């Protein structure tokens, strides 16, 4: 099924990228001199939706629901979003609070962590604002809605609930620190696709399977994905799953079938926006009518046509890590080759039917 409208909420803001000169993880009480990168960093909703708008914004309406401050930063961000092809009519402006700020600390191996300011304009995103915006946008079965981090959990859950009631396809991304909150709110029953990274997958699994919490930390790759799927499927038998593992690739689960996607083999400059780019590309593929997985069809080794939404996600993540900024600005519709979507960088991964 194709979708002609994408509506989502999450953080919109900018930030700074700090580069650690040593690989050791920053200690709780440690002070460390770091380098400030000239790279531009952005908050999650902006990153995810940039790929959707840049690739298919001319045929699919893309509506971010969030807030920025009545400041220069907010005005610049809205301009960038419009330039990418997003509709910003439902972006609020706060006179009291500044635009969201995020700080990323990156280690020499290009991995890192993010800290995002809570008391920013994005805190103005409320469940009431979400519901009224979705009503005005006439969200329906032809709409994909996405709940992205960096606004309140209550607002994201309201978006999922409203989207589900209106027949939309619902996508959820859950930060590790909020796994318990979303489980208690039955949010996993309100989504069609759960998209998480390795750390987030462990957190959700630990919240669901406390008796085996110790084993969760030892699980990796397909074992972790299968255990997580077995837990969320009990709550939502139709749920699909996307789990990214950075340079180790990603896995999808759909219809009790596991599929592996290797990471694009490219030169890496910055990984901070890769996971969000993967999700943005995957959502784009779903809007185009691609299935999450290649299903039962096996590609020839030399085949370049993309057969799944997750493969388009891999392509976008590959573009992202080659860019110093957390958004790959060169993303454009030319990447999509007519009806057949092609990419020479992505090879066939291993597929297997796993749950009988």
Question: What annotation goes with each model-predicted range?
Answer:
Residues 80-97:
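A glycine-rich helix N-cap at a beta->alpha junction
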Residues 1-10, 179-180, 207-356:
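Conserved phosphate-binding/catalytic region of the ribokinase-like
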Residues 92-94, 104-144, 149:
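Conserved phosphate-binding/catalytic loop of the ribokinase/pfkB sugar-kinase fold
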Residues 1-83, 268, 347-356:
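Glycine-rich phosphate/adenosyl-contacting loop at the front of the ribokinase-like
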Residues 101-105, 114, 249-253:
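Short beta-strand scaffold segments in enzyme catalytic cores
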Residues 59, 165-169, 234-239:
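A short helix->loop->beta-strand "cap" motif at the edges of active sites that frequently abuts
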Residues 142-223, 248:
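Conserved beta-alpha-beta core of the PfkB/ribokinase-like small-molecule kinase fold
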């Amino acid at each position: 099924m194709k979708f002609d409208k994408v509506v989502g909420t999450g953080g919109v803001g900018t930030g700074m990228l700090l580069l650690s000169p040593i690989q050791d993880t920053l200690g709780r009480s440690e002070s460390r001199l770091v380098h400030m990168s000239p790279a531009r960093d952005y908050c999650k909703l902006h990153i995810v939706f940039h790929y959707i708008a840049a690739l298919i914004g001319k045929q699919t309406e893309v509506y971010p629901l969030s807030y920025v401050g009545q400041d220069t930063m907010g005005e610049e961000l809205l301009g960038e979003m419009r330039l990418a092809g997003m509709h910003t009519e439902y972006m609020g402006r706060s006179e009291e609070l500044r635009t969201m700020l995020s700080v990323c600390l990156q280690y020499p191996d290009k991995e890192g962590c993010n800290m995002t300011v809570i008391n920013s304009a994005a805190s103005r995103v409320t469940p009431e604002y979400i519901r009224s915006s979705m009503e005005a946008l006439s969200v329906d079965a032809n709409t994909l809605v996405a709940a992205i981090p960096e606004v309140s959990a209550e607002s994201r859950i309201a978006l999922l609930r409203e989207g589900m009631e209106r027949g939309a396809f619902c996508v959820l991304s859950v930060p590790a620190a909020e796994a318990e909150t979303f489980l208690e709110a039955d949010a996993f029953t309100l989504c069609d696709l759960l998209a998480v990274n390795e750390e987030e997958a462990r957190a959700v699994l630990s919240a669901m399977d406390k008796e085996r919490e110790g084993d969760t930390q030892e699980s990796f790759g397909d074992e972790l994905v299968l255990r997580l799927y077995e837990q969320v499927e009990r709550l939502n038998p139709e749920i699909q799953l996307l789990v990214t593992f950075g340079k180790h690739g990603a896995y999808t689960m759909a219809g009790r079938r596991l599929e592996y996607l290797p990471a694009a083999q490219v030169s890496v400059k910055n990984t901070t926006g890769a996971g969000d780019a993967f999700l943005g590309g995957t959502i784009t593929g779903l809007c185009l009518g691609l299935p999450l997985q290649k299903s039962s069809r096996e590609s020839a080794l030399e085949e370049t046509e993309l057969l799944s939404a997750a493969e388009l996600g891999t392509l976008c993540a590959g573009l992202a890590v080659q860019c110093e900024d957390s958004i790959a600005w060169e993303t454009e519709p030319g990447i999509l080759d007519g009806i057949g979507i092609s990419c020479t960088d992505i090879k066939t991964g291993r597929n297997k039917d796993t749950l009988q």
